[in-house]
Amino acid sequence: MANKQIEKMLQGLNILVVDDNAYMRRLTRTMLTNLGGRSVLEASDGLAALESIRTADPDVMLLDWDMPVLNGIEVLRIVRSPGVFPRPNLPVIMLMARAQRAHVNEALRAGANEFLLKPTSPKALCDRLISIVFKPRPMVTLGTYYVPQPRRLSAPREAVLRE
């Protein structure tokens, strides 16, 4: 996809970046701005994130896993609770410092649309944003949470993942 086309797609998005580390928020903001993002909001903890969602109505949220007050998983569970929170279908990219399989699985079960390792590359960030905002998977109810429909894997890939 051409850079101008990507810029045009991203410039209309209202993006919320939630991370307790000011440097990571600034780095992510810079990447988003360089990709064409024009409206980037920031929150430094989970409570501030919930308030920003209520007041600013972002199109997508980049959410850190490990934060004080409310961590990323707690925020995600609140956001994905239909009837409890006003935006259960908000696209969420979970940001993680370590790619532990248990954390990735927990994030996806709690309703993360995608995940990225920190620090991430502009290309990976752009690819995830395009994936969840412009090619979203349908949302489904899983227990008490509202989550993206699981991806369908081919039989050979599924067998590899089970091993």
PLM region spans:
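Receiver (REC) domain active-site loop signature in two-component systems and cognate sites
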Residues: 67
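Short amphipathic alpha-helix used as the core "switch/output" element in two-component signaling
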Residues: 51, 73-87
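Active-site beta3 strand of CheY-like receiver
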Residues: 56-62
